[in-house]
Amino acid sequence: MNYKSKETLGIIFAIIAYFSFSILDAIQKSAVLYYSIFQLLFIKYIFVLLLSILEARRTKNISFYRSNNLKLQIIRSLLSILESGFFVLSFKYLSLANAHSIGALAPIIIVVLSVFILNEKVSIKTWVAIFIGFIGVLIVIRPGSDVFSVKSLIPLIAAFFLGLYQIATKKTTEYDSPEVSLFYSSLVGIFITSIMTFFFWQHINLKSLWFFLPIGIFFSLGIYFQILALKNARASIIQPFHYTLIFWAIIFGFFFYEDIPDLFTILGAIIITTSGIFVINQTSKR
């Protein structure tokens, strides 16, 4: 397969991955009203554990449980729990479109954190785009106005932890394979959420399967196709498709929850997306 064909395949896998994550979020928005966040995360990590074992078997990686930097894997896994937890919590209080528009700041936050944590250099153009991206978030959450809610900060906190998680992921690739990272994410995730679920338990019955099974399946599909996408195309090609989450959030929010985003949300989302794609393109040139 030639280079262009591989990139096209990577893009197709990325679209499928983010579509899967979008369906997952639409389901989680309902599920979080009935079950604790930790119950939902526990199910997701169970499926990730199965996925990591299957992926290790497919790639014949018999040492997928051995990490060359256990401390970093644990930190990365804890950041994954925080990032996922805050995003799911945001769906309880905000529309899918609002949550994803604010959360879309994550790629920009990654660049900012990379400057302070990894000592990476950023151009003036990139800093301007980052500033514009933050203005986009302010347009969405509108601090000081009557419609502002402190709950609008939840996806912003999630985006911050996602930024830290992505940086930790970048560092773990220097030590371990994706199968190892998947395995430890699931292992630490299962351990932490099983403890927290004990304190935040909500009654489960057979009807719960209608929530839990799709959550586990679509989360696994999203991760699996994301891995395939990054194997076939550069991250700078794949990352802009992260913003399709906003498009699907508007569609699913309208059809399933009758949420219609206002002009400020749409305008803010456009600004965040445009500045985010610019930042991604600029950083890929370095």
Predicted regions, residues:
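Helix-helix packing/entry segments at the starts of transmembrane helices
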Residues: 99-105, 172-188, 223-254
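C-terminal transmembrane-helix exit sites in multi-pass transporters
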Residues: 87-89, 106-128, 200, 247-266
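Hydrophobic transmembrane alpha-helices of multi-pass small-molecule transport proteins
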Residues: 125-141, 264-283
